Amino acid sequence: MKTPTPTPTPTPTPLVLSIALAIALMADANASRLDDVEPPEPGDPSAFSDPPADSAAALNNLLSLPEANLGAFDLPEGEGDRTTPRQENERPPALQTSFNYPTNGAPSPMFGAQPFSQQLLLFEEFGPTRLDPTTPAGLLVFPAPSTGPAPQQDPLDVARSAPSGPLLDAFLKQPGLTPFPGQFANVVDRNPWQQQIELFLNRHIGSAAEGRPPGKGWSHQRWNEFYPQAAYKTAQAGARINSGLRDAMQMHHYSVGEFGPGGLYYNTAGQANTLGTTKGVDTRFHPNMPLQDHKSLWTFDGTLPAKLLMVRYGQPLLMRHYNALPIDPAANHGFGLHTISTHEHNGHAPAESDGYANAFFFPGQYYDYRWPIQLAGYDSINTRAEDPRAAFPCTPGETLWVNDANPGLKTCENGSIRIRGDWRETMSTHWFHDHMLDFTAQNVYKGNAAMMNYYSALDRGNEAFDDGVNLRLPSGSALSWGNRDYDLNLLIADKAWGQNGQLWFNPFNTDGFLGDQILVNWQYKPYLDVRARSYRLRILNGSVSRYLKLALVREIKGSGGEFAGPKGSGLSYARVPFHMIANDGNIMEHAVPFDGSMDLDANGDKQDHNAILPTQGIAERFDIVVNFAKNGIKPGDKLFLLNLQAHDTGKGPKEAIALADVLSEKYQAVIKQTSKGPQWDKGDPTVNKILQFNVKPYSGQDLAMDPAAYEPAKPGKAEGKVMIPLKLHRDNPADIARLAQARHRTFIFGRSDGTDQAPWTVKTDGGFGYHMDPRRLNAAPQLATGPTDAGASGFGTLEIWKIQNGGNGWSHPVHVHFEEGIILSRGGKAPPEWEKWARKDVYRIGSEADGLDNVEVAINFREFAGTYMEHCHNTQHEDNSMLLRWDIEHPGQLQLMPTPLPSWDGVKYVNSAALPTWRNGDGKGPQVKVGK
């Protein structure tokens, strides 16, 4: 029998399985024996410990301990603190204004940039390749920083500089991974930047090559069963010009479909020198604006376009993430921290690869994130891998190791290979981003964010593939899977920049941060050419504190549209309806029409969501299908995506502005001159058009599905077809009975018991309002089972979490890591249509009309154990300190998992302390009565 390739070079430790033993275990064909899943032995650095004898005293002791991330602030003369990275901010508190946009800053200068005068940059694929242990070891090492010309390097100071761009590209382009990845953290090899780091710190350091915490507790769970079949490497780096490094890694190779010669997207940036390449694409928000300095913008590879990871269900993947940021924690233009932890939002990933806030790594190091890319329910549902809806999309000749009734390599037949797990848990649109403790907002704002598309038998990215399983969502058909011709990723986020054009952030205001300009894929008001046919738009709100409310309209010459344009413009506008097909990266049971045919939130108004999306909290993803050939749209037309959601502060949204008022410019922010300098007046400047679509002729055949065939029941029309059904239904008697036995927990997000330094807190199960401490454990569901053999069945551990707003007009988009939940109720009512049919990982609680202040969520815990997080995704709230730790424990676990504390000298562990209700919660079953 063939098996997945075991690691050929395990890190030296007695706990690692030998190659021969791994092969023997796999040949035995028992999933439960492929890997050792027992807790770490005593003596292992990550060994568990007994709960404190006096838990109250242990919890109280945490309040007086040093910050858990203190090791990140080391300076030549000792330790800094969280104020160190703020030292060079161009607007310290003494120079700040009372203006709202941007928060306590001044309007961002435009440098003559005109709206809709630059082409939108589409995402660039990372391009994973097969992880091959026979690839010769690379000769190039991760290049250390050196002095060089600004803005890509510092001309004088190595500790404030970056690696040479050509050297970094040569290293990233080198085939394979050296050293080869293993189950355990690589603590044998040294940090290749050690010499430069020691010169800066003026002392010796004990920094390993890999920043992952050592020991079995943070080793890759089920390493042999989910051995990575594909891999890639990238570096978080300061801004630099793209060299075309990843041109050959694009699936389309700039040769087919709309990305090929003659296609709409063959020219990546609309410039004469960007035909079929990203070489020369720089880091300006608009061609008229300055280049970003390497200390201002920190992106994946250090370049634009923004990056996209494309994965397939069933194929485990490894990302080697290098940290190429400055050694000096103050070399950051006054915001952002050089230590990072990467969270795949919201992957079904083991804790060691989830991006825990206090599992951060340092400049010069890498961290191997291994993402299994398996369907949730792997151990309990469809464990024989017999359901065609749970499958790996493939091309003829491809193979995949599957742990079914006859474990081994399976060959691609009829375009797919069946895999284990619950097909109802299929995900689609994700992203990954930094999660550094206390610095998530700053680091993500600064560029540490990429998008991630999951492909599956149901959502394979080939609209022509008709096997009765594939939903045939808009995509294209030139490739077997993963076509992006008519499938667009849109990262929308507000930003601000100073008078020199460099990105600016205010880290001093703990209420939240608002920029005064919205960028789409890091560009100021771009345009995009689209064909007259259907498209899928994957929309991510990547802001710090700003909610969005997006609308889509068509511009009409003359007065024939529903909405008048600005006075004297001779223009009017018509709504462009669409369907939502996925929410938070999860394809829904039904495609929800935003066309005025349904009262989507039962408020008596069908028009309030006609061509207008609901409020979109930070980190929420909405996938919509738009047809640019219907509703009167024709080639030559212009369409606009607008934001209608106004804010005054970062605490939460104000009101949505009427679409008519925005289009007529009755509502329009303007800059006025004041005694304190220029200031935005008469509204929020981001309430405006943000993206223009130019419709071009289409001569092909649109083979994509019609979302109208999948709508829920509505007046005059019966329920349509189902895309992906929910695993639980709120009105199903069997599900109601199951929910009644589920453990219940309550989390209240507010400011109770907060301090000036850490104002935002979370109360758990009626307890004290704590600020974040990674050593404190708030909740710990236990797995129902360990790894299972083919034929096993079950439901996993089911709990109900109530997420409650603490009041006072604030709003919080709460994110629970690891698993999606089904909203049972929102504010004591049934959820609106866009949540009724959805699985979610961000739960917006607030006073906005389509929000309400609490949700009860049914959520499962399966397959993996370890330490995870729950937090407000207004990341300025999270960083100050609206974040908590929860663990998934092994079956029957009695001891507590320890807490990693990283530093330049390695990672040490300390014991954890748990709340009194950490295992039992506060009851059983739903506790909110749902009204009509």
Segments (PLM) and residue ranges:
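Charged, glycine/proline-rich intrinsically disordered loops and linkers
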Residues: N273-R284, A376-R420, P577-N583, I587-G604, ...
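Gram-negative bacterial Sec-dependent N-terminal signal peptides
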Residues: K2-N30
